[in-house]
């Protein structure tokens, strides 16, 4: 029964793996709910800043900000948001594939790129393909704080304000629902018209500025862009936990199927061994 013992060992090994993937699925489900709550909590903040900044900009068209103006630089910046850990299906692969397509188009046009990496997976990828990483933020944990993101992101924002890069793109995975996430590479700077469009349901107020309109608009636009980046990180984390939960559930289900197949093979092997022993006993008795 050497073969039977070997199969029993395989069954035990797969059962242990199934316990691990089941535990990871349950942990991911718990983290996913919390990540979704943080993602939803961040949206009203960025929406309110957008409304106020849009109203101020429309009421004071004589004021401009570098974030709303284009330039002729030959370098494009990317804020690449990925995960620190794996085991989340094709989440990182999909967004990095979109980024690669964008980089190839830029290379064909003779343009350069530099990036800020948020997450270990994106940082490793950018280093492998030779894209200049101006700054990075990793090991953000399950509760990302804006303070940890501002420093690295500010590197690209300052470069854009100084006219050193012509655009900044935000690469991340947008959360749609538990079973669906969408990889996106969207323009962050210069701010497009749709990003600066006030909510139609909001009242149009007359504001009193302190110290002045230009200072308020400048501060709000910086906070708004930072909020957009934070929102992308929050959505990416919700997507990560959803993808990990689905991946671990699939692994658990597959492990169950493998165990069933191995048990069937074990039973057939055991049955064949018993039949062989009985045949030998009968043959021996007949010889006597």
From Swiss-Prot:
<comment type="function">
    <text>Produces ATP from ADP in the presence of a proton gradient across the membrane. The gamma chain is believed to be important in regulating ATPase activity and the flow of protons through the CF(0) complex.</text>
</comment>
<comment type="subunit">
    <text>F-type ATPases have 2 components, CF(1) - the catalytic core - and CF(0) - the membrane proton channel. CF(1) has five subunits: alpha(3), beta(3), gamma(1), delta(1), epsilon(1). CF(0) has three main subunits: a, b and c.</text>
</comment>
<keyword id="KW-0139">CF(1)</keyword>
<dbReference type="GO" id="GO:0046933">
    <property type="term" value="F:proton-transporting ATP synthase activity, rotational mechanism"/>
</dbReference>
<protein>
    <recommendedName>
        <fullName>ATP synthase gamma chain</fullName>
    </recommendedName>
</protein>
<keyword id="KW-0375">Hydrogen ion transport</keyword>
<dbReference type="InterPro" id="IPR035968">
    <property type="entry name" value="ATP_synth_F1_ATPase_gsu"/>
</dbReference>
<dbReference type="GO" id="GO:0005886">
    <property type="term" value="C:plasma membrane"/>
</dbReference>
<keyword id="KW-1003">Cell membrane</keyword>
<dbReference type="GO" id="GO:0045259">
    <property type="term" value="C:proton-transporting ATP synthase complex"/>
</dbReference>
<dbReference type="Pfam" id="PF00231">
    <property type="entry name" value="ATP-synt"/>
</dbReference>
<comment type="similarity">
    <text>Belongs to the ATPase gamma chain family.</text>
</comment>
<keyword id="KW-0066">ATP synthesis</keyword>
<dbReference type="GO" id="GO:0042777">
    <property type="term" value="P:proton motive force-driven plasma membrane ATP synthesis"/>
</dbReference>
<keyword id="KW-0472">Membrane</keyword>
<keyword id="KW-0997">Cell inner membrane</keyword>
<dbReference type="InterPro" id="IPR023632">
    <property type="entry name" value="ATP_synth_F1_gsu_CS"/>
</dbReference>
<keyword id="KW-0406">Ion transport</keyword>
<dbReference type="GO" id="GO:0005524">
    <property type="term" value="F:ATP binding"/>
</dbReference>
<dbReference type="InterPro" id="IPR000131">
    <property type="entry name" value="ATP_synth_F1_gsu"/>
</dbReference>
<keyword id="KW-0813">Transport</keyword>
